[in-house]
Amino acid sequence: MTRFPVTSLRSVDLGTPVIDRAERFYTSVWGLEVVIRDQGSVYLRATGSDHHVVALHAGVRPELRAITFRVDSADDFAALGVTVAEQGGQVLSPPGANAGPDGGTVMTVRGPEGGLLRFAHGDRQLAPLPQGGYRPVRLAHVNLNSIDVDASATFYEKALGFRLTDRSKAMAFVRCNTDHHAVVIADAPVNGLNHVAFLMPDLEAVMRGAGRLIDAGFPIAWGVGRHGPGDNVFAYFIDPAGFVIEYTAEVLQVDDS
């Protein structure tokens, strides 16, 4: 059975110029809950045990500030630091106590394309919440635009221990557990965030959630449909700051034992 040093996608940090509107949207419409507000930032949880899945930070423009993954063991930090450097990344802060509300130990690196990646171990877990008919459980994946898909995929494979699951003409799908993909890398003229996907309990939850979004004045940007790679159901929307976000469910599970 494959061992992954990185075991899951946990959260994203988003800068937004409309943080009050964004908080209302993600809590009243999208189905997340506030965990804590702290100095211009809002931490939002889903129904799963992750301390938060989105951290909103007041800023002058919409931007992806960081992606946080969880590592299997504190012993994995040292090896990741070496392979990140070997593959063109940079360790910005070595493993140390996390001053954020999620606690634990965190290491921060910059990938070859400039994005910040955080790796957490021993971070705070919360008691799961009842799964409502339209509420996300956790993050499913992030989709990143890249000027060099193959180079980006290679970094995730060789530096971070992900495995390539699928490769289409324009996208690479890499995973760090049995989910078909945790990161998608899409061919684009500039590097950056394409979208963030939230896992829903099932197809019915995607449909119910989509209905709530439409009723609240947020039309479906694309969907409801089913992707080829990953076989997952999808519905895409645009949040108040312009970020593309996705409800998804029924993600293909990969068994390579």
Indicate where each model-derived feature is located:
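Core segments of cupin and vicinal oxygen chelate
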Residues: 4-51, 98-99, 105, 144-182, ...
